[in-house]
Amino acid sequence: MGFKRGDVHLVNFNPSKGTEAGKIRPAVILQSDCLNNAEHPSTIVIPLTTQLIANAAPLRLTLKARDKLQQDSDVMIDQPRAIDNQRITSDKLTFLTETELATLENYLKIVLGFDD
């Protein structure tokens, strides 16, 4: 199964600890396509939730339901995680538009302190 930056796949986040996102849920592939194309054994992702929070930028980015993403979902930008590729359990559900991916990258810069 190939992965591409900005694609959304189902990921098995179990087991989780404390405030970590758990269960099987959609996640955005964040990792560079350079690593994805090299079939790197792990992938950096950000989980989604259907527990929407309005006006929560830069911690959340809302994606509208489309393609195989069945519900509106928030990208939990404060929860990026490296996972083993075996945790990715589906083909692509949908993908982020160029605008959504650029917004996600800007929010990540804020959350991770890259612009400090």
Regions found by a protein language model. Name each.
Residues E20-I24, V28-A65:
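Compact nucleic-acid interaction/catalytic patches
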Residues N14-G18:
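Short, charged beta-turn/beta-strand-edge "cap" motif at the junction between a beta-strand
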Residues M1, A65-D116:
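C-terminal terminal-subdomain/extension
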